[in-house]
Regions:
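Alpha-helical transmembrane segments of polytopic membrane transporters and translocases
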Residues: 3, 29-51, 84
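Short membrane-interface helical motifs at transmembrane helix boundaries
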Residues: 91-109, 167
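Membrane-interface helix-loop junctions in multi-pass transport and translocation proteins
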Residues: 141-144, 154-186
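Interfacial transmembrane-helix starts/ends
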Residues: 37, 70-87, 91-99, 117
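Membrane-interface junctions at transmembrane-helix termini in multi-pass inner-membrane proteins
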Residues: 122-149
C-alpha cells in the first residue's frame, strides 16, 4: 500500500508541473488539477460505494467456494460481477454524461467540473468492473497479484503524464486515465479467469 500511496503522490506532483511545461500558468494548472482531483473524481467514484458493499458481501462466498474447490461457482460469480459492474457503470455513465453540467453547477458551482465529468464519465464501467474483480481476487488469495497490477497501472499513467502532457496538455492526462483503466480492467479480468480455471 505504501508503494501505491507513493505512486499517487508522484502523479499528483507531476500533473501540475507537466501542465506548466505545456504552457499553462501555474494558477491555471493548479486550478485544472484541483478541479479534476478534488471535484470530478470524487463524483465519479461515489457510486462505487454501492459496488464496495456488494464486494464485501461477496468475499466470504468466494473464499468458501475457493476452499471447497468449486471452480464452476467461482466462474459464475466472476461473470456475474463483471456483468453487474458493466451495467452499473453504463447507467452512471449515462447519468453523468447527461447531467454533467447540472451536477457541476449544483454541487460545486463549477462549469469546469461539469466539463471534466462529461469527459471522464466513460471510465465508470471500467472502474466498477475492475473494482469488483479485484475484490474477488482478494477473496481468492491473490492480493499480491492485485497490488502488482495496481502498480503497473500507476506506472503506465505516470509514464504517459511525463511523456505526453507537456506536449498535448490536459487531453493527454485524460487519455492516460482511460488507457490505465483499460489496462487495469483487462489485467484483472485475465487474472480472475486464469485463477478460476487453475
Amino acid at each position: 500500500m505504501a508503494w501505491l500511496r507513493f505512486s499517487s503522490s508522484v502523479e499528483n506532483v507531476l500533473i501540475p508541473r507537466t501542465l506548466k511545461l505545456y504552457g499553462l500558468s501555474p494558477a491555471l494548472a493548479l486550478d485544472i488539477f484541483g478541479t479534476i482531483s478534488g471535484l470530478t473524481l470524487p463524483v465519479l467514484l461515489f457510486p462505487g460505494v454501492l459496488c464496495s458493499c456488494a464486494c464485501v458481501m461477496l468475499l466470504p462466498s468466494v473464499s468458501e467456494a475457493n476452499a471447497a474447490g468449486k471452480d464452476t461457482k467461482i466462474t459464475k460469480t466472476i461473470n456475474s460481477c463483471a456483468l453487474f459492474g458493466l451495467c452499473f457503470g453504463l447507467i452512471f455513465t449515462c447519468i453523468f454524461y447527461l447531467l454533467s453540467d447540472f451536477i457541476g453547477d449544483f454541487l460545486f458551482s463549477s462549469k469546469l467540473c461539469g466539463y471534466f465529468l462529461r469527459r471522464l464519465c466513460f471510465l465508470c464501467p471500467l472502474m466498477h468492473i475492475s473494482g469488483m474483480l479485484c475484490s474477488i481476487l482478494h477473496g481468492l488469495g491473490k492480493a499480491k497479484q492485485v497490488l502488482f497490477v495496481n502498480l503497473l497501472t500507476c506506472a503506465i499513467r505516470i509514464l504517459m503524464i511525463m511523456l505526453l502532457v507537456p506536449h498535448y496538455g490536459i487531453d493527454a492526462y485524460l487519455w492516460a486515465m482511460l488507457v490505465s483503466h483499460v489496462f487495469m480492467t483487462l489485467a484483472v479480468r485475465i487474472l480472475t479467469c486464469h485463477t478460476a480455471h487453475k
